[in-house]
Amino acid sequence: MKALFSHYKKLHLWLLANLALLSAFLLARRSRGAMNALTEGFTNPLRRMLGRLCECVPFSVSEGLYVLAAMGFLAFLVLGVRAVVRSRHRSGTVYALVLGLGNAVLTVYVLFCLLWGANYYADSFTDKSGLAVEPVAVDNLERVTRQFAALVNEYAGDIPRAADGAFAGDRAEILAYAPKIYENLYEEFPFLEMTDVPPKTMRFSRVMSAMGFTGFYFPFTGECNVNVDFPAATLPTTVAHELSHRRGIASEQECNFLAVLACLRCGDAAYRYAGALSGYIYLANALYSADAERWRAVRETLDERVVADLRASGAYWAQFEGLADTVSNAVYDGFLKSYGTIGVKSYGACVDLLVAYFK
C-alpha cells in the first residue's frame, strides 16, 4: 500500500485535498451563519464577477465548456485505452487512469459545492423576505387560481398572435428586456437588487428540450442560459427564473415564485402575460390534484388564445416524452435531494408562496 501511494503520490495527494475540502464543506453546511458568510462574502460576488466577464463573449461559455468536457472525456477514453494496451503494468495504468478521472470529477463537485451548493444552506428568499407560508386550503387555492385565470385572460390580448392564435412574441425582444425584469421588486425586496444582463441562448436547445430543461444557471461562469426552441409564451418566466438563481436563490420553488412575481410587476406585455400564464399553470395543476371539479370550472373560463398557448406547449413537450427525459429528470431529482430539497416535485411547492402572497 505504501509503495502504491508513493508511486502515484501526486494523484493521492490530489484525492486527499479533495476529500479534505469536501469534508470541511459538509461540516460547515450545518452552520447557517457560516454558509451566509461564505455566500454573501465570497461565492455570490465571485459568480457575479465571472458573469460580467463572460458577458463580453457573444456565445454561452457554459455551453462551450460542456462541449469541451465531452470532447475531453472522449479523448481521455481513447488515450487511456491506448495507454493500457501499450503498458507493461496494465493494472497500475488502469488504477492511475481511474484515480485521475475520479479526482477530476470530485474536484468539479467540490468547486460546485462551494460556488453554488452553499446557497442551499444559507438564508433563503423566504427567510429574507419574511413571507409566511402556511398549508394551503383548497378554497384559497381556487380563489388565487381564478385570479390568475382572470389575469392571463386580460393580458392575452396585449401580445402578437400567430394564425392559430398562439403566442407570437419576438424572442430577441424578450431576451433584450431581461435586465429590467426585477427593477419593480427592489423596493419590496431590496436584497434582490443587482445589475442584470441578458441570458445566453443555447445552440443545443433541442437537446435541452429532449432532456426536459428550459434553462439553467451555470455557477462556474455566472451565466444564465436559456433554451430557445420551446414555445415562447413562457420564455419570459424562464428568463426570470434563471435570473433569480443569479441572485443566489437556490430553491426551485422560490425561483418559480419570483419569476411569476417579477414578470407580473414589470412593464413589458410579453413578460406580464408569461407571468400570469405560468402562475396559472402552477396553481391549476395543484388545484386539479386537490379538486378536479373546481379545476374544470376554472379551466372553462380561459380565453381561447390562452388555450391555444397551452395546447402548443403540450404538443411540443409531448414529442420528448421518453428515456432521455425520464433519465435526466431522475438525475436532477437526485441532485436536488442531495442538497436537502424535496426533489423535482418542489417546483410545485411555489404554489404555497403564490397563495400566501396573492390570497
Predicted regions and their residues:
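N-terminal membrane topogenic signal
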Residues: K2-L15
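Membrane-embedded alpha-helical segments of integral membrane proteins
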Residues: L19-A83
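Active-site recognition of the HExxH zinc-binding catalytic motif
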Residues: P58, L235-N256, V260-L261
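Transmembrane alpha-helices and immediately adjacent membrane-cytoplasm interface residues
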Residues: F73-V78, G92-T126
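Membrane-interface segments at or immediately adjacent to transmembrane helices
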Residues: G117-E187
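Post-HExxH zinc-binding segment in Zn-dependent metallohydrolases
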Residues: D139-R143, A250-R294
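Auxiliary, metal-adjacent structural segments of Zn-dependent hydrolase domains
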Residues: P160-G222, V228, A232
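Pan-zinc metallopeptidase signature
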Residues: R305-K359
